[in-house]
Amino acid sequence: MNPIVKSFEYGQHTVTLETGVIARQADGAVMASMGDTTVLVTVVGKKEADPGRDFFPLTVNYQEKTYAAGKIPGGFFKREGRPSEDETLIARLIDRPIRPLFPDDFTNEVQVIITVVSVDPQIEPDIVSMIGTSAALAISGIPFNGPLGAARVGYVNGEYVLNPGAAELAGSELDLVVAGTQSAVLMVESEAKSLPEEVMLGAVVYGHDQQQVVINAINEFAAEAGKPRWNWTAPVKNEALVAQIKELAEEGLTAAYQIMAKQERYEAVGEVKKATIAKLQEANPDVNVREAADLLGSLEKNVVRGRIIAGMPRIDGREPDMIRALSVMAGVLPRTHGSALFTRGETQALVTCTLGTERDAQKIDSIMGERTNRFMLHYNFPPYSVGETGMVGSPKRREIGHGKLAWRGINAVMPSAEEFPYSVRVVSEITESNGSSSMASVCGTSLALMDAGVPIKTSVAGIAMGLVKEGDNFVVLSDILGDEDHLGDMDFKVAGTRDGVTALQMDIKIEGITKEIMEIALQQAYGARVHILNVMDQAIGSARPDISDFAPRITTIKINPEKIRDVIGKGGAVIRALTEETGTTIELEDDGTVKIASNNGDATREAIRRIEEITSEVEVGRLYTGKVIRIVDFGAFVNILPGKDGLVHISQISDERVANVSDHLQLNQEVTVKVMEVDRQGRVRLSIKEAQVKEPAAE
């Protein structure tokens, strides 16, 4: 075994790429490390494509092994299970920038597996995983137009920071991941605290500039360790068939793409394609139907793009910067804690908000450590939203990714736990879809949160931008349709407030996207965002003053931290009795904060009264009403507060002489007593005869 190793400095860390020792039967295998965070990346591709396949079957599997953090998995089986949400998101993060770098007609199956084998809690594995994937593909010999670089950019004290650690990222106003080739940005994923557009654009440019060191290092690594390139050539295009299809279908496709309603348009396009294939088969029974279908798809793309570049109206008749018709409603469901229906053209989101207590928060135990998520946003994309049938069940990768993007867009305006001590779950049900459903979810979430009385800092809206570029000519499109996303060169989603950007996601399919184009897209997105916010604010412009009658009301009180154990009781007996008997939910924190949640105000007040009883101190000179719990020869013990008993000496029972305690007191008898003394050992001396005055007793 002769290892080939390449190391280079990248930001605050040393990155090392190594091959030739592990997983030598894979087409490409790289052990990539950044500090103590190490991943094994393997790439395997099939030498032959399956006959009849008309798509590129790329699979990216990202898996975090608990041994990487020195942990044993939980659960009965004690082994890793299905991918977590974090693993799914990182797999998508790696997939998105590498997919457009494979040749257009390449349909051989390729599988990339990234395994995290060691982790430093301060260094996230995502960036080194992207670097390792790029290196493994570069040395594999598989057709790949890389290498690819990747960088994380933070923004601390007005300065950009390259690959900040977890501690530094906690104080950053920006968490942006950018990936690209030597000449082009391909992918951006970010979350920000309402930063101006120019700061966001500057971060993208900064990250792309800094990652050139990665690209150069991978090129040097591949020159030394790379396998011979596969002998693969793109299939030769049948120009005669191209011309024939253009003659038969161009006019019909042009007419079909002037139909504004999505379903009617799809039917018309389908009829044109069906008629074209039939005419081709009539003229030549041996025509390759799959090839003809592919060429029809290319013609369809050219027709739509050509009209846009020529300055003609878009598919639905809009100008490039126009937004579709908006319909905004808040409070649409009677029993939910908050709800909204946001409709933009043929895209619609029904969004609900549910409030819960701290115990409803999501507890996440990952290899990076444990964390609690008080704000959850779940996105569902049922098949009926696009007029189709399909499987319904657990969320797919796309749904998890879209939900996280919407979460990033909203998270910057969420109140702190001190301002609003609730856990919040938002669910976005996409009931209609024709482009930009994730951004509709952002708008709907902002509305539903306000309807639920969540004091978010300000309204948030999202918009999806597109691009059509031919040579030096380009058109930036606002509020893209699904077809414009599919047929265009860029998907550029921006969420934010009037003051700045809270989330930015960008996927670019071509090279040559300049800083100028991104700047125009961001400014156009700002105008669209403000327009949407104005419409949203007409429906509901700020959080409702009170939460729903159906939501739990949380009341917070403070107790002496030393009294927490008294409230909990032995084996949790006291707090369990409190919650069951009052019908409330009670949560205790180490600093003595007690949160009582209930839909019933009387139940909350009763729980507070009982907690105050348990935690209160016995006051000398105060009267208490208690029960006799034990009788002895020299007196009786009386319980005056939960967990607090005192002795009434036989001489303090009555003004008269008492010979036998049982003649005057019985077990469980209620008596009023006065506290005479609490000694150094906490023992309480009580008197019944001194309490025989006209004063109200403490309950």
Swiss-Prot record:
One BP annotation, GO: RNA processing
Main location: cytoplasm
GO (cellular component) term, any one: cytosol
Keyword Transferase set for record: yes
SUPFAM superfamilies attached to this UniProt entry: Eukaryotic type KH-domain (KH-domain type I) (SSF54791), Nucleic acid-binding proteins (SSF50249), Polynucleotide phosphorylase/guanosine pentaphosphate synthase (PNPase/GPSI), domain 3 (SSF46915), Ribonuclease PH domain 2-like (SSF55666), Ribosomal protein S5 domain 2-like (SSF54211)
Sequence positions that bind Mg(2+): 485, 491
Keyword list, A-Z: Cytoplasm, Magnesium, Metal-binding, Nucleotidyltransferase, RNA-binding, Transferase
Gene Ontology terms, MF aspect: 3'-5'-RNA exonuclease activity; magnesium ion binding; polyribonucleotide nucleotidyltransferase activity; RNA binding
Ranges where the S1 motif domain occurs: 621-689
InterPro entries: ExoRNase_PH_dom1, ExoRNase_PH_dom2, ExoRNase_PH_dom2_sf, KH_dom, KH_dom_type_1, KH_dom_type_1_sf, NA-bd_OB-fold, PNPase
Subunit structure as annotated in this protein's UniProt entry: Component of the RNA degradosome, which is a multiprotein complex involved in RNA processing and mRNA degradation.
NCBIfam families linked: polynuc_phos, PRK11824.1
Job description of the protein: Involved in mRNA degradation. Catalyzes the phosphorolysis of single-stranded polyribonucleotides processively in the 3'- to 5'-direction.
Assigned protein family: Belongs to the polyribonucleotide nucleotidyltransferase family.
Annotated protein name in UniProt: Polyribonucleotide nucleotidyltransferase
Organism: Shewanella amazonensis (strain ATCC BAA-1098 / SB2B)
Classification lineage: Bacteria, Pseudomonadati, Pseudomonadota, Gammaproteobacteria, Alteromonadales
